[in-house]
């Protein structure tokens, strides 16, 4: 199994074994750090049913909230890409933007922070603030939600 050091992961959970953190590693504070957020499994690459691996779903704040990577109706028919080229997706097969948080809620998504609180974050949030909420140890504090 692949492993990563805790210092290599900016979020609360990591992709590989050993990459998760404990509360003491959340130096920006648990009320300033996203732990979980909404994802739309059909809106990412890696697998037609979502960005999924044996260990779970991967998502982050690298892409803007609700960035359109959803291969819906006009793009996909069963397991086939629409050959007409009328797809409205933005890089649904890109490692940089595909694993972003996204929701079917209008205007944003629900997030659980490391302190257990739940917040609706607007998709119009300042992108730098959004990224700050996604990093547990950057010493950059986001504006209050």
What would you call each of these model-derived segments?
Residues 1-145:
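Surface-exposed loop/linker segments characteristic of extracytoplasmic
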């Amino acid at each position: 199994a692949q492993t990563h050091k805790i210092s290599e992961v900016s979020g609360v959970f990591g992709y590989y074994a050993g990459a998760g953190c404990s509360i003491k590693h959340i130096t920006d504070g648990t009320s300033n750090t996203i732990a979980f957020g909404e994802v739309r499994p059909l809106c990412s690459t890696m697998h037609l049913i979502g960005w999924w691996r044996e260990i779970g779903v991967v998502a982050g704040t690298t892409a803007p909230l609700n960035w359109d990577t959803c291969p819906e109706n006009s793009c996909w028919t069963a397991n086939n890409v629409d050959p007409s080229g009328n797809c409205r997706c933005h890089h649904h097969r890109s490692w940089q933007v595909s694993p972003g948080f996204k929701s079917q809620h209008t205007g944003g998504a629900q997030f659980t922070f490391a302190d257990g609180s739940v917040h609706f974050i607007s998709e119009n949030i300042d992108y730098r603030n959004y990224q700050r909420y996604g990093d547990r140890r950057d010493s950059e504090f986001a504006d209050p939600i």
